[in-house]
Swiss-Prot record:
Family annotation (SUPFAM superfamilies): Glucocorticoid receptor-like (DNA-binding domain), P-loop containing nucleoside triphosphate hydrolases
GO biological process: DNA biosynthetic process; thymidine metabolic process
UniProt cross-references to Pfam families, sorted A to Z: TK
Its job: Phosphorylates both thymidine and deoxyuridine.
Keywords per UniProt: Allosteric enzyme, ATP-binding, Cytoplasm, DNA synthesis, Kinase, Metal-binding, Nucleotide-binding, Transferase, Zinc
Gene giving rise to this polypeptide: tdk
Catalysed transformations (reactions): thymidine + ATP = dTMP + ADP + H(+)
Enzyme class: transferase
Positions contributing to Zn(2+) binding: 145, 147, 182, 185
Family assignment from sequence similarity: Belongs to the thymidine kinase family.
UniProt name for this protein: Thymidine kinase
Record organism: Escherichia coli O6:H1 (strain CFT073 / ATCC 700928 / UPEC)
GO molecular function: ATP binding; thymidine kinase activity; zinc ion binding
Length: 205
């Protein structure tokens, strides 16, 4: 039986690397995979999933208007698909998460989704909210804060490196705009208005 998986984490936990490895494992066994990523995120070039360690794969793009079930069913009818993998799945809509559950339930194709659980305000993304609700399997990919604790929160930094938690939910950036930290240091950095000051304080504790 196929299942819907949600692999979630903070930033820089190796989500894209894990996706590419999963896709490779299927392909190595002669199975066909289809990879999707969000059209909104083109940091590494449109139409591909890239990891920070240099791996990459071509990918189909989705936006809020994409009919994922229809697309996948049409492609599956032409040539069998053995697994669908979705990067940046936090950008999925409620309807698209439902459609991916239909890919699993109606077409019997496993769907592996990789993305962030929460945004820089500590709020759930819509896609993540429904994946948490409807997935068969939830898997946390762990990364660590500068203090060594598990990083579960994402800080957004302005151009001067100051953390803030207001503004639009989606601003695409890499390491220079976002950093993963534990909950304690997320709260402290916002309170003090400086991640650097918190890091310095931690070094001297």
């Amino acid at each position: 039986m196929a299942q819907l998986y949600f692999y979630y984490s903070a930033m820089n936990a190796g989500k894209s690397t894990a996706l590419l490895q999963s896709s490779y494992n299927y392909q190595e066994r002669g199975m066909r995979t289809v990879v999707y990523t969000a059209e909104i995120d083109d940091r590494f070039g449109a139409g591909k999933v890239s990891s920070r360690i240099g791996l990459s794969s071509p990918a189909k793009l989705f936006n809020q208007n994409s009919s994922l079930f229809d697309e996948i069913r049409a492609e599956h009818e032409q040539q069998a698909i053995h697994c669908v993998l979705v990067d940046e799945c936090q950008f999925l809509t409620r309807q698209q998460v439902y459609e991916l559950s239909e890919v699993v339930d109606q077409l019997d194709i496993p769907v592996l989704c990789y993305g962030l659980r929460t945004d820089f305000r500590g709020e759930l993304f819509i896609g993540s909210q429904y994946l948490l609700a409807w997935s068969d399997k939830l898997v946390e990919l762990k990364t660590i804060c500068f203090c060594g604790r598990k990083a579960s929160m994402v800080l957004r930094l302005d151009q001067a490196g100051r953390p803030y938690n207001e503004g639009e939910q989606v601003v695409i950036g890499g390491n220079e705009r976002y950093v993963s930290v534990c909950r304690k240091h997320y709260k402290e950095a916002l309170e003090v208005g400086s991640l650097t000051a918190i890091q310095e304080r931690h070094r001297h504790d």
